[in-house]
Amino acid sequence: MSTDSVTRIAHLSDLHCGSPHFKADLLERAIEEINELRPEVAVISGDLTTDGFEREYRTAREFVDRIECADLIVVPGNHDSRNVGYIHFEELFGPRAQTLHKHGLTIVAEDSSEPDLDHGQIGRNRYPHIEGEFAGFANLNLFVLHHHLLPIPGTGRERNIVYDAGDLLELLLRSRVKLVLAGHKHVPYAWHIESMFVVTTGTVSTLRLRGHGRPCYNVIEVGPEWVRIYRKYPFEGQEPIIEFSRETHEYEKHGLGAVT
């Protein structure tokens, strides 16, 4: 637990346990770095496995159990739902949708995966639940899913946003969501749309990378008046991405065009 007024969230994605590209030393180092930060919450936005097999899930669970935090939020990705893998997810990680009202945050996490398909959607049947979870709270609102909510440069021609992205964006903006966290295509990026930031992280522990990408994860620091987001590279330090005001929504971007 932080000793100051800052709440910290570690955001990891795309572990891909079982992949020939998986590097255990990267994940071990990331977990060491995260534990040094002592975050209140750890968020894992899917693709813990490569093919959804039970043995891959058990490996992922062993690593995740090493993360020291008060609250853990995990959703499945498209790889996790292969081979009926969502059954193993529920057995080892619990419900595929979670909500946390704590630490001055409201975090709603939803499963965007479809069995044996790479594309995803949330589905309008989930909209009333999502809107209800955000209603009546004065906290900082965050939404978590695996797939992209907006297109990401450098991710190819695959349709990798959720099919119902437009409706979901409108719902989240109406619900005063300030930050969306996702993974999926191993390309870290950030969009600013109206009063909301949509931030993806890359893969934390595989070398299945695009171009000059590097394994990475994000750390979010939430202060009383501001939010800061950093991109961290296991073994290789960190760089700031965004800082924004919780009240005025003014923001400062960092890096080479990382935020648009």
Describe each region flagged by the PLM.
Residues M1-A10, T99-A109, A135-L142, I193-V198:
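Beta-strand-turn-beta hairpins that frame and shape the catalytic cleft
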Residues M1-D65:
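N-terminal active-site segment of His-dependent metallophosphoesterases
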Residues T3, G223-T260:
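A short C-terminal boundary segment appended to hydrolase-like catalytic domains
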Residues L12-S13, A42-D47, D71-N78, D111, ...:
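Active-site neighborhood of phospho(di)ester-bond hydrolases with catalytic His/Asp-centered motifs
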Residues C17-H21, T50-R55, N78-Y86, P115-D118, ...:
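Active-site environment of divalent metal-dependent phosphoester hydrolases
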Residues E54-G132, L171-L173, V219:
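Extended active-site neighborhood of metal-dependent phosphoesterases/phosphodiesterases
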Residues F137-G154:
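Short acidic, glycine-rich surface-loop motifs adjacent to enzyme active sites
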Residues R157-R228:
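Conserved beta-sheet core of the metallophosphoesterase superfamily
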